[in-house]
């Protein structure tokens, strides 16, 4: 009887958990479409800013910090985008694992990484392990706004533009989760600064071949009032747009990961309920069989006594 009461108690508690998991899954399902659309809609603007920066840097020969790394400064900024809440499967643990790997590689290369963390789960993880954190931000990791992107970008830009002797950094990395689809989300490491120029491969012309009628010619730019001032103006927009895009795709990934995790948890809870119900029914059947056996045995004993 005691085992049956314990099984009933476990079934009730598991049913309550299943309801919670299912509710979390439904909430995530209602948010994922919007999160995905917001992330996709932000990408064209970010790509346009990045193309503009690439064009500025590729077609000029300058020593602006946006394009040139200070080789004498070993300090490097690393921004990890984690989550505020749990119940998202391996989302935060994957980010932390990749961040730890990046920090190890930077240490091995003789760098001095400075850690910046967005998300309560990540900051709690590193604070518990007494890891020095340059700055942390929390709140709305599943629905980040422009304000938090601006706050983070201002902090990182100040660190990047600050001279080395005053604690500035020479590189800026960001670790985030890219939303591919509802099933696949991949952890990425992006070196945001200095800007890496992607050079197109050019084919060596064959003198025997006729030259094409049209050819890709690098456009000529005129910068007003000056190239340096244009770069100074576009740098904050570049950093903020890249960080905002990473925040949005990370939010979509977090929501998708939470939906998948809650769907799996709901299925596991229901399977556990079925298993516990079978055990309860078997226990009841055993109790009934034992009671019937005792009744039949007692009846046989009374019959023999009367004879």
Curated annotation (Swiss-Prot):
Gene Ontology molecular function: ATP binding; proton-transporting ATP synthase activity, rotational mechanism
Cellular compartment(s): Cell membrane
Keyword field contains Membrane: yes
Gene3D superfamilies: 3.40.1380.10, ATP synthase, gamma subunit, helix hairpin domain
Principal localisation: membrane
GO CC aspect terms: plasma membrane; proton-transporting ATP synthase complex
Membrane topology label: Peripheral membrane protein
Keywords associated with the record: ATP synthesis, Cell membrane, CF(1), Hydrogen ion transport, Ion transport, Membrane, Transport
Keyword Cell membrane: yes
SUPFAM superfamilies per UniProt: ATP synthase (F1-ATPase), gamma subunit
UniProt cross-references to Pfam families, sorted A to Z: ATP-synt
GO biological process, one term: proton motive force-driven plasma membrane ATP synthesis
Signal peptide as annotated in the record: none
Similarity comment: family membership: Belongs to the ATPase gamma chain family.
Subunit structure: F-type ATPases have 2 components, CF(1) - the catalytic core - and CF(0) - the membrane proton channel. CF(1) has five subunits: alpha(3), beta(3), gamma(1), delta(1), epsilon(1). CF(0) has three main subunits: a, b and c.
Described function: Produces ATP from ADP in the presence of a proton gradient across the membrane. The gamma chain is believed to be important in regulating ATPase activity and the flow of protons through the CF(0) complex.
Protein name as it appears in the record: ATP synthase gamma chain
Source organism per UniProt: Bifidobacterium longum (strain NCC 2705)
């Amino acid at each position: 009887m005691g085992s049956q009461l314990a099984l009933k108690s476990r079934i009730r508690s598991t049913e309550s958990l299943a309801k919670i998991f299912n509710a979390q899954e439904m909430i995530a399902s209602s948010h994922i479409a919007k999160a995905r659309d917001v992330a996709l809609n932000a990408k064209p603007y970010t790509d346009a800013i990045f193309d503009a920066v690439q064009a500025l840097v590729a077609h000029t020969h300058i020593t602006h910090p946006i394009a040139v790394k200070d080789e004498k400064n070993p300090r490097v900024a690393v921004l990890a985008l984690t989550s505020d809440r749990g119940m998202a499967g391996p989302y935060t643990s994957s980010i932390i694992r990749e961040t730890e790997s990046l920090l190890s590689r930077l240490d091995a290369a003789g760098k001095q990484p400075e850690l910046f963390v967005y998300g309560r789960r990540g900051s709690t993880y590193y604070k518990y392990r007494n890891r020095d954190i340059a700055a942390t931000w929390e709140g709305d990791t599943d629905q980040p706004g422009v304000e938090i992107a601006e706050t983070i970008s201002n902090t990182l830009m100040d660190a990047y533009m600050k001279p080395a002797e005053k604690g500035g950094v020479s590189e800026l990395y960001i670790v985030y989760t890219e939303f591919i689809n509802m099933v696949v989300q991949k952890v990425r490491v992006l070196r945001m600064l200095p800007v890496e120029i992607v050079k197109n491969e050019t084919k060596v012309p064959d003198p025997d071949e006729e030259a094409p009628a049209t050819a890709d010619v690098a456009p000529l730019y005129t910068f007003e009032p000056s190239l340096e001032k244009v770069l100074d103006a576009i740098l904050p927009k570049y950093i903020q747009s890249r960080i905002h895009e990473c925040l949005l795709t990370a939010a979509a990934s977090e929501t998708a990961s939470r939906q998948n995790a809650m769907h799996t948890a709901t299925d596991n809870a229901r399977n556990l309920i079925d298993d516990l119900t079978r055990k309860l029914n078997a226990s009841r059947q055993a109790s009934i069989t034992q009671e019937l056996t005792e009744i039949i045995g007692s009846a046989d004993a009374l019959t023999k006594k009367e004879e």
